[in-house]
Amino acid sequence: EEDRSGIPFSGEDGKLLTLMLSYIGLNRNNCYFSNLVFWRPPGNRVPNKEEIKICLPFTREHIKIIQPKLLVLVGGIAANSILNFSESVTKLRGREFSYQIKEKKIKVHIIYHPSFLINSPIEKKRTWFDLTEISKIIENEKY
């Protein structure tokens, strides 16, 4: 679906992500989405290190141009690549990190990827908790 539309998170993953956003009062019109890798790897596999290495500078430039007040990284590959970590989402979610752009620090939160949640519905409860925390940040900061 994403290949046809050119829009990140447009298939089943996208439907769940849209629902998740609506839970905290957001929608696709007041958020910016970008994939870490700008093409679908063959066989819908996880992007390899070389593909990430090629695309990461462009993704970082997107973040620099957009200048978000809050960055929500979706899934472990995005989180580990952007923040230069090597941890599971399970260890990273529920915590606040920062991403530096020049002199500005951007708050970062990490959530499970919707495809993971579709296959592991038990983790949805943790994700709703994470979204509630993100919602509080948005409300407190008046984004």
Task: Name each model-derived stretch.
Residues 1-143:
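A polyanion-binding, active-site-adjacent surface
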